[in-house]
Amino acid sequence: MSTKQTEKMEVGIVIPENVKVRLAGHMLHVEGPLGKTHKNFKKIPVDIQINDDKIMLKALGERKKYYAILNTSRSLIQTLCDGVVNGYTIKMKIVYSHFPITVKVEGKKVLIENFQGERAYRVSNIWNDTKVTPKGDDVIITGHVLTDVTQTAAEIELNSRVKNLSLIHISEPTRPRLI
């Protein structure tokens, strides 16, 4: 590899003002105004160092594979920092043809009632610190960890999927929620 390509093997991420980042072994802890989260980098071949206001990532090899892993790691850390500052929101729409679907939240479960006229309700899990609020024909999912918010939305969508019939689907995709 030429020297120009090896210069790309180190990337810096600027830490936002009100975010605290610390590294304990291979575990990166990120804390902000909306909450705290962590990511384990044990099996990811990237060297992480935290300076005053920057996180420095360095690839452990010079091949294209390591460059791809470096950029993926940068994206993961940027997502963690954005989440604890702005949060993430997904808006889902309840669509039905005859039987009105009702959505209720009980603890860490989302109950989908009267789906296709079924007497039993369908149950979806709420992941970690994600909040689900049903409002009329909309279900709004918010949280500070992107994977938890999207996984909660995916479970609700999969539990209400029947071919060519009623469903609950994502009407507005994930984007950072601005405070």
Where are the predicted features?
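N-terminal, positively charged regions that mediate nucleic acid binding
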Residues: 1-42
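Short, surface-exposed charged micro-motifs
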Residues: 18-20, 45-47, 100-102, 131
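Signal for well-folded cores of large energy- and translation-related assemblies
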Residues: 24, 35, 78-85, 89, ...
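Acidic (E/D-rich), amphipathic helical modules within compact regulatory domains
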Residues: 29-78, 82
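Extended intrinsically disordered, low-complexity coil regions enriched in Ser, Thr, Gly, Ala
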Residues: 37-42, 121-127, 146-147, 151-153, ...
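Extended, positively charged loop/linker patches that create polyanion-binding surfaces
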Residues: 59-142
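Mixed-charge, glycine-accented linear interaction segment located at domain edges/termini
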Residues: 135-167
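Single conserved hydrophobic/aromatic residue that forms the stacking wall/gate
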Residues: 168-179
